[in-house]
């Protein structure tokens, strides 16, 4: 969550006013932004930690988006570097869960899959060093957009710290228009670690 017209630290106080105890922080330009190196410095992190303490609201998860499945190897390496800094920041904020996306390009799914697994291998020591859990979601326009292939990709990593996040707003993307929520949730099994809940529209209803 964010209120774009106030500093990120202030959103924690706003969350307290609204009755929340935990928040998930999505990309914003002054913290971590889509595909860019995180901009939070020590002072920024200290301000967020102060806000957590004063408000009583805990940053439960971060939701970074980095193109770590990019088929361009130089760009992929840059995105892995972005991830390393993000994980360092998460540790300083005492955030132990991160939700993210596969990214990549749906037009080159096989090559992107290779790159994603390569990035996971390179970042495994970092996730394990900080004791951070990673929950992946299949997202529209990523190299994997459907529920079942995403589950298979996550299972293939075969690490206890990586799981699946089901995003209800993307239900009809995940199911190719079927909307079979119960089947998807059950098929995720023990890999299901987090659920995002919101209204959803079937974009294929009139195809």
Residue ranges of model-derived segments:
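N-terminal-biased segments
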Residues: 1-12, 16, 38-45, 79
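Gly/Pro-rich active-site loop or hairpin
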Residues: 4-5, 32-39, 73-74, 143, ...
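Alpha-helical scaffolding within the catalytic cores
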Residues: 7-11, 43-48, 147-151, 179-183
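Active-site acidic/histidine proton-transfer and metal-coordination neighborhood
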Residues: 10, 51-55, 68-166, 173
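Glycine-enriched alpha-helix->loop->beta-strand junction motifs that scaffold or abut catalytic
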Residues: 19-22, 156-163, 187-193
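Glycine-rich, proline-tolerant flexible connector loops at the mouths of alpha/beta enzymes
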Residues: 24-52, 70, 102-108
